[in-house]
Amino acid sequence: MSDYLSVTALTKYIKYKFDQDPHLQSVLLKGELSNFKKHSSGHLYFNLKDNNSVVNAMMFKAQANKLDFNPKEGDEVLIEARVSVYERQGNYQIYVNKMHLDGIGNLYQKLEALKKELKKQGLFDTKHKKEIPRFPKKIAVLTASTGAAIRDIYSTINSRYPLVEQIQISTLVQGKQAKDDIVNKIKYADTLDADVMIVGRGGGSIEDLWNFNEEEVVRAIFEAKTPVISAVGHETDFTLSDFVADVRAATPTQAAVIATPDQVELSQYIKQTELNLSRHIIQIINNKKKHLEHVASYYKFKQPSLLYDQQIQKKDDFERQLNLSITTKLNNALQKVELLTNRINLKDLKQQTLQGIQSRLQLHDSLNKSIINIIDNSKKRLSQRIENLNSLSPSNTMLRGYTIVNKNEQVITSTQSLEKNDEINLQMKDGTVDAIVKKVRCNHNE
């Protein structure tokens, strides 16, 4: 009995053989749809037949949603599928991945071959994609002069960003002459110094959209220096122009949205930016004001003499050190002269004495001149420093009639800091005055 297989075991073995056969994983079939049914789940169940044979088939919802037509009983179709076994009934059947109406199969093969070649050449590489400007000044629109596409694009641009200049370039999008016209219009638009170019049309069959799969059109988009937005057909339509363009839009309306900012959002952004700038400027002004008040309250500005008292003392110390140094050098020189004088032979005493006296006189004159020059230069530098300090001195300002107002030991710089009956202190050039505010008058222009 162990040599006998169950029906289930046999069916599983046959299914295993089917699933392991690479020739059955992707087969291309053509035939007629019969017994066609669409389940409530979205899956499709049908038979594919020709004059001599029939095979069961099904297509899952995920693949069925990608169809570019609505299949029906009697349609002649081209199918890509895998072959397997439905274990419950023991029947082999096909699981369909792709399905197209027969008659355009050659177009799809041509499309896939060209797509593969252009991809190999790098035309679809991300590194070639140009950025779409955020705030375009000029937009070139290449599409038919009539139809829903141009209306959708213009109405969307006008509602979102009416400031932009729109250049309509009427273009053939269907027919035998459309390919060359699209290429020429792309090259022309590329000379207009536009910020972005929209190339597209409304939806249609694969034959209607085929001009946007032509190699010449694809290369024209690739070679354009102007950023290109492709907007061909509906969301489920894909052409080679979509792959080579800098951005692919699902519809002409979406292309207009991608190409333009929203004026409402821009207005809100500008208002928020203005508010942020105002807050930042006010914060800077307040910080500077606090810093100025802090500096004005610094004790050296309350007692201006502190700014230059130490400099005067340093000058006096320098003069004392200089005089001491000169005196020391002079005494050393005189000692050397006396020492040399004592060594002079008696017979040359008179001559040496005269020469020594003359040298001492010359040395004395030279030292006096040096001392005078050093003292004069020091006085000039000191005078310049005192003059600079006086120009900054509040005391010097008070000599011209100005007064420093203090309240609670804080310098008052504005009438807004005072109120009636406030006790204040007025610091003048020769003393201080205590006073009480009777009335405050504010200059409202500041």
From Swiss-Prot:
GO terms (BP aspect): DNA catabolic process
Keyword Signal listed: no
GO cellular component, one term: cytoplasm
Record HAMAP family: Exonuc_7_L
Organism field: Staphylococcus carnosus (strain TM300)
GO molecular function: exodeoxyribonuclease VII activity; nucleic acid binding
Protein name from the UniProt record: Exodeoxyribonuclease 7 large subunit
Protein family membership: Belongs to the XseA family.
EC number: 3.1.11.6
InterPro entries linked: Exonuc_VII_L, Exonuc_VII_lsu_C, OB-fold_nuc-bd_dom
Highest taxon, organism lineage: Bacteria
Major location (coarse): cytoplasm
EC class: hydrolase
Signal sequence extent: none
Coiled coil: none
Record carries keyword Cell wall biogenesis/degradation: no
PANTHER family in the record: EXODEOXYRIBONUCLEASE 7 LARGE SUBUNIT (PTHR30008:SF0)
The protein's assembly and partners: Heterooligomer composed of large and small subunits.
Catalyzed reactions per annotation: Exonucleolytic cleavage in either 5'- to 3'- or 3'- to 5'-direction to yield nucleoside 5'-phosphates
Localization: Cytoplasm
Gene name linked to the record: xseA
CDD domains documented for this protein: ExoVII_LU_OBF
Keywords, in A-Z order: Cytoplasm, Exonuclease, Hydrolase, Nuclease
NCBIfam families for this protein: xseA
